[in-house]
């Protein structure tokens, strides 16, 4: 299974990196390492997560309050967004629709 991180999702990851990096030096790298591990798990587990917002699957991160929203087309997982779950649900919905 291939994984493709779309531009907006890559920007979400960078934004998350800088948020955590400003909290504590090195925490941003730890954030990225964990989120990429979560994303990598989709090679095996893509499609088993619950669907949310406009038919996106939602993978919850194991270490951080972030969710990975993705779609599966044939043998490719498309990562559309990586969002902070602490945000207003209306904002999350708006961002994904």
What are these regions (language model features)?
Residues 67, 71-97:
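Enriched for short, Lys/Arg-rich terminal
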